[in-house]
């Protein structure tokens, strides 16, 4: 699953796609994302120490592809592609209005692993469209009857994960 990384430093902001990301720990909630040092977003994130991660529905797959293949050094992607956002509550990073789930992060560590820098960060704020989630056995899970999630297959190809996708419970 590809997420949209949003960043802001001083009067500059940017949005980019990231396919390498994961939860690292829960107490406190730590999340990591791999970024190329050459990316404009990397500069903004390292200078501000903050950024956002946004999960968007499948109707944004084309936007994910576009913002992931164009640099913010040459254009304001928010203006160019009419991307609506609010300023984050705690860290003032862009949080997409159409995100069904989003985080605001404070950078706590960064390490180089070849072509990418793995940036670990502490979650400062969580945004969730409550209507798009359900509780199952004490776990909050996406309600796939209300969501269609884009899954990146590679080479600009996306699939849709939704309620009609095969799902199995192996418990």
Regions found by a protein language model. Name each.
Residues 1-171:
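Basic, polyanion-binding surface patches
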